[in-house]
């Protein structure tokens, strides 16, 4: 799943996604279920390097947040199927307010792809039972980690120090 997901996303597409993340005033990240865990993990990483990112899994709060977004903001929607009604409602509202949408979704054509400014694709060989979404979630996590590493590499002056400082603050809690 991970090799296939890397193969289907060109370096150019990945760098365009990095630019969307880096240039956004605010990044709202959402996903449902296992995709929501990937969203939360990625938002924490982005915050560590100074990117204003929020993960929102509560769909009522998500819709309230999205309607107040602007063209300077980015909605990152993570959904393997790309067909979750809640995620597509948020994407539709983001479009209405002029917000850009980055989707991390499956390669099979879906509703989320049609609304997104840009897509990164995950390839997963899920069984009918979706094997607890292990394959798709692993591919999503790999892509978000790749985006994070690229963002760090593009900001070597500040990002590593911010990560170290964040870790030092957390260590003070224990």
Functional labels for PLM-detected ranges:
Residues 6-23:
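A short, well-structured juxtamembrane/interface segment
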Residues 157-174:
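A short, charged, Gly/Pro-tolerant segment at domain boundaries
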Residues 1-3:
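Helix-enriched interaction subdomains in cytosolic or periplasmic regions
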Residues 23-142, 146-155:
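Glycine-rich phosphate-binding loops that contact phosphosugars or nucleotide phosphates
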């Amino acid at each position: 799943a991970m090799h296939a997901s890397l193969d289907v996303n060109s370096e150019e597409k990945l760098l365009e996604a990095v630019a969307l993340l880096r240039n956004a005033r605010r990044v709202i990240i959402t996903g449902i279920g296992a995709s929501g865990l990937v969203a939360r993990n990625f938002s924490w990483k982005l915050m560590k390097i100074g990117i204003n990112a929020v993960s929102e899994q509560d769909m009522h709060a998500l819709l309230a947040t999205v309607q107040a977004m602007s063209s300077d903001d980015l909605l990152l929607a993570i959904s393997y199927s790309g067909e979750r009604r809640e995620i597509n409602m948020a994407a539709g509202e983001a479009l209405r307010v002029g917000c850009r949408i980055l989707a991390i979704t499956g390669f099979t054509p879906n509703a989320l792809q049609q609304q997104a400014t840009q897509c990164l694709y995950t390839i997963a060989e899920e069984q009918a039972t979706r094997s607890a979404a292990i394959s798709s979630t692993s591919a999503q996590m790999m892509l978000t980690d790749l985006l994070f590493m690229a963002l760090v590499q593009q900001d070597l002056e500040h990002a590593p120090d911010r990560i170290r400082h964040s870790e030092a603050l957390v260590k003070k809690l224990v």
